[in-house]
């Protein structure tokens, strides 16, 4: 499947290859892991990620998700964290109904592709040895608008509102 930018404004597409909502319990391999509250069944990806902010989708780096892509223009950002509170884009305050208020005359599900900031994140990691050969799922808990996910250069899925 090829990811499409128009999914952002298509109300019939809100998830592609996403698991159904479910209870998110923490599971442990052993009683000792439970006592220590550290599960070898999870691999946190918190920390510093490669990052570049773009003012709109057309300005985002093309093909940054490909294996071996040149990320020399990327900075870093702490994950978890909001890009706006880390110096990128404009903060959204609760006294403004929508981020585009006063800038664009939009009605949902329209998206102003000329004024829709994009954060492009990249992270390299090795899967923990205990997880190799197992079914592995990735969870993003806090993507504000929408996200497209690639792993090892292959499109994995699309999701909106991961809160």
Predicted regions and their residues:
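Accessory beta-strand-rich segments of carbohydrate-active enzymes
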Residues: 2-20, 27-36, 50-54, 82-86, ...
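Generic detector of ordered secondary-structure context
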Residues: 41-44, 66, 117
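Mature N-terminal segment immediately following signal peptide/propeptide cleavage
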Residues: 41-53
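Hydrophobic residues on conserved beta-strands that form the core of alpha/beta folds
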Residues: 46, 71, 121-122
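Surface-exposed, flexible loop/turn segments at secondary-structure boundaries
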Residues: 57
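Short Gly/aromatic-enriched secondary-structure transition segments
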Residues: 60-80
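Aromatic- and acidic-residue-enriched carbohydrate-binding clefts of CAZyme catalytic domains
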Residues: 101-103
């Amino acid at each position: 499947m090829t990811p499409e930018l128009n999914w952002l404004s298509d109300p019939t597409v809100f998830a592609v290859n996403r698991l159904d909502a479910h209870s998110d319990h923490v599971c442990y391999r052993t009683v000792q892991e439970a006592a220590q509250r550290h599960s070898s069944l999870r691999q946190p990806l918190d920390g510093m990620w490669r990052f570049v902010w773009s003012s709109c989708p057309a300005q985002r780096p093309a093909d940054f998700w490909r294996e071996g892509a040149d990320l020399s223009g990327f900075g870093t950002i702490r994950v978890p964290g909001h890009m706006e509170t880390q110096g990128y884009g404009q903060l959204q305050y609760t006294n403004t109904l929508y981020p585009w208020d006063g800038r664009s005359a939009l009605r949902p599900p329209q998206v102003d592709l000329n004024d829709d900031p994009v954060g492009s994140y990249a992270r390299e990691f090795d899967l923990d040895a205990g997880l190799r050969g197992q079914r592995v799922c990735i969870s993003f808990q806090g993507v504000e608008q929408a996200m497209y996910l690639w792993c090892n250069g292959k499109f994995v899925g699309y999701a909106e509102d991961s809160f």
